[in-house]
Regions:
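Conserved HGGG/HGGXW glycine-rich cap/lid loop of the alpha/beta-hydrolase fold
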Residues: 10-71, 85
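Conserved alpha/beta-hydrolase "nucleophile elbow" surrounding the catalytic nucleophile
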Residues: 32-34, 94, 98-100
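Conserved acidic catalytic loop of the alpha/beta-hydrolase fold
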Residues: 77-94
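Flexible "cap/lid" loop of the alpha/beta hydrolase fold
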Residues: 107, 111-112, 116-156
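Conserved alpha/beta-hydrolase catalytic His-Asp/Glu region
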Residues: 132-141, 152-215
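Short beta-strand/loop motif that positions the catalytic acidic residue
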Residues: 217, 223-225
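Acidic catalytic loop of the alpha/beta-hydrolase fold
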Residues: 227-232
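Catalytic active-site module of serine/aspartate enzymes centered on a nucleophile-bearing elbow/loop
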Residues: 246-278
Length: 278
């Protein structure tokens, strides 16, 4: 366990909580989804460490055990935080694994910082290329009315919102694909977030356009997604990301919800570890 400090101009230091398995293995940085924390990777960290990798997780600003500043929730700043992590820990030859919202930092990283530190990347149930349906993004899977409803729901009641959100997160066609205990763990992680951060990041992942970032991905890439994902539907996200990154690999986890890392950890870990070994 450690903390790194992200610096953004004068008096803008933000401490980020980091967990690092250490060791001399090639580093894998796991970037969590909204509105969870690095603890959401507990089905992955031991398996990846056992396979010989140095596994680094961190809590995004505003979430988990990290500082919760009032500002800094654009993808440019969030990606700057990721870059600070890589430079502070002096990580090279890194695989970035971005789950859901975390795929945004992965996409934006190439545009801002290039690929010098990177070995490969994984877009896992990830939000790129662009969630919000607009006139010039007709394939966006998120309707503006849906986004407004989410914002209103979280603003009104965190308890009610996270109860419904985690149910959808882990369900396929109304059937929960994890245990109730696992769903409750996700609710507990969500409640560690600051509401202002959760709302700001909701806007960021819904409205940020990554279509110009994806062609900059210049290392091997894997897209892995559940075909029963009702939160970030595959056809409007993972399928398009795979098409936008020449040479990318695609693995669809059949019958899997958005929260596939918890519902289908054996298959998910096997596929990602096979990709990491390349």
């Amino acid at each position: 366990m450690a903390e790194i400090t992200a610096h953004h101009g004068l008096f803008k230091d933000t401490d980020l909580h980091v967990d690092d398995t250490g060791g001399s293995g090639r580093p894998v940085v796991l970037i969590h989804g909204w509105p969870l924390s690095g603890e959401s990777w507990k089905e992955q960290v031991p398996a990846f460490a056992e396979a010989g990798y140095r596994v680094v997780t961190y809590d995004r600003r505003g979430f988990g055990r990290s500082d919760k500043p009032l500002t800094g929730y654009s993808y440019d700043t969030l990606t700057e935080d990721l870059h600070t992590l890589l430079t502070e820990l002096d990580l090279q030859d890194v695989t970035l694994v971005g789950f859901s919202m975390g795929g945004g930092e992965v996409a934006r990283y190439f545009t801002k910082y290039g690929a010098d530190r990177l070995h490969s990347v994984v877009f896992a149930s990830a939000v790129p290329p662009y969630l919000m349906k607009t006139d010039d993004n007709p394939d966006g899977p998120l309707e503006k009315a849906q986004a407004a409803q989410m914002t209103a729901g979280l603003t009104k009641s965190e308890d009610d919102f996270y109860d419904q959100f985690t149910t959808d997160f882990f369900s396929v066609d109304g059937e929960l694909k994890v245990t109730e205990e696992q769903r409750q763990e996700a609710i507990a992680l969500a409640k560690q977030s600051a509401k202002h951060a959760a709302l700001a990041c909701m806007t960021a992942f819904a409205t940020t356009d990554f279509r110009e970032d994806l062609p900059n991905v210049s290392v091997p890439a894997l897209v892995i997604h559940g075909d029963g994902d009702g939160t970030v539907p595959f056809e409007g996200s993972g399928a398009r990301t795979h098409a936008a990154i020449p040479g990318s690999e695609l693995h669809v986890v059949h019958g899997a919800p958005h929260g596939v890392t918890v519902s289908h950890p054996e298959e998910w870990n096997r596929v990602v570890l096979e990709f990491l070994a390349k």
